[in-house]
């Protein structure tokens, strides 16, 4: 069964979060899976494992939203591709650990298409610039994509965020994923000049390859 892809543009975080919860609560075994592709206005989100103290420099212009996904604190804002994966894992025949691995692989494959070598870090969900990547040394090991999920009754929501041309200064206000000193980078800083639409399309293709049975 294919997934319905929705391009939502720039969407308020709180209302999108409520819509994800409502969709997941209302869905049945016959409900079509959906993939939402969007950007958010600036917002910090704090996951279930989060410590509000990891927002060490609060901003009056950027709100903090407590959410029910796994993980710690992160930032969303314009120039970041956010993909929410509303999937029936039972129907796909996978568990959450496998889902995480497949999402990570889709991001790694996408970045490779644009000349950035990236990798997983055990125990720290997300994608990081690898030593094999031809980038300035200060960006080796920097986080370029975040991942956080919630699974309810075998159905997932939340998803991933890939930094393309993001306000990296906002990340300096937090300890990303709870790690003090963790650098965050975007594709533009690494010299990738392709536009958001091109990168988004490629990411979507890799996600569908990994997650949607042919």
Swiss-Prot record:
The active site is at 177 (acyl-thioester intermediate). CDD domains: LipB. Signal peptide: none annotated. Pathway: Protein modification; protein lipoylation via endogenous pathway; protein N(6)-(lipoyl)lysine from octanoyl-[acyl-carrier-protein]: step 1/2. One of its GO terms (cellular component) is cytoplasm. The keyword Cytoplasm applies. It holds the Pfam family LplA-B_cat. It is found in: Cytoplasm. It catalyses: octanoyl-[ACP] + L-lysyl-[protein] = N(6)-octanoyl-L-lysyl-[protein] + holo-[ACP] + H(+). Residues 29-214 form the BPL/LPL catalytic domain. Substrate binds at residues 69-76, 146-148, 159-161. PANTHER family: LIPOYLTRANSFERASE 2, MITOCHONDRIAL-RELATED, OCTANOYLTRANSFERASE. In the reaction, the free carboxyl group of octanoic acid is attached via an amide linkage to the epsilon-amino group of a specific lysine residue of lipoyl domains of lipoate-dependent enzymes. Catalyzes the transfer of endogenously produced octanoic acid from octanoyl-acyl-carrier-protein onto the lipoyl domains of lipoate-dependent enzymes. Lipoyl-ACP can also act as a substrate although octanoyl-ACP is likely to be the physiological substrate. This is Octanoyltransferase. It comes from Polynucleobacter necessarius subsp. necessarius (strain STIR1). The lineage of its organism: Bacteria, Pseudomonadati, Pseudomonadota, Betaproteobacteria, Burkholderiales. The gene is lipB.
């Amino acid at each position: 069964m294919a997934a319905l892809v929705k391009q939502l543009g720039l969407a308020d975080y709180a209302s999108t979060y409520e819509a994800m919860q409502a969709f997941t609560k209302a869905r049945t075994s016959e409900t079509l899976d959906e993939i939402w592709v969007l950007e958010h206005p600036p917002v910090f989100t704090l996951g279930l494992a989060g410590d509000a103290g990891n927002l060490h420099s609060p901003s009056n212009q950027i709100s903090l939203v407590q959410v029910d996904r796994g993980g710690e604190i992160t930032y969303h804002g314009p120039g970041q591709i956010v993909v929410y994966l509303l999937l029936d894992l039972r129907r796909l025949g996978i568990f959450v650990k496998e889902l995480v691995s497949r999402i990570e692989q889709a991001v790694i494959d996408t970045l490779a298409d644009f000349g950035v070598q990236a990798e997983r870090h055990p125990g720290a969900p997300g994608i990081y610039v690898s030593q094999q990547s031809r980038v300035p040394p200060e960006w080796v090991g920097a986080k370029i994509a975040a991942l956080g999920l919630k699974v309810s009754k075998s159905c997932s929501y939340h998803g991933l965020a890939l930094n393309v041309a993001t306000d990296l200064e906002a990340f300096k206000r937090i300890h990303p994923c709870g790690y003090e000193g963790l650098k965050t980078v975007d594709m533009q800083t690494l010299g990738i000049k392709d536009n958001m639409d091109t990168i988004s399309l490629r990411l979507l293709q890799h996600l569908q390859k990994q997650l949607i049975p042919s």
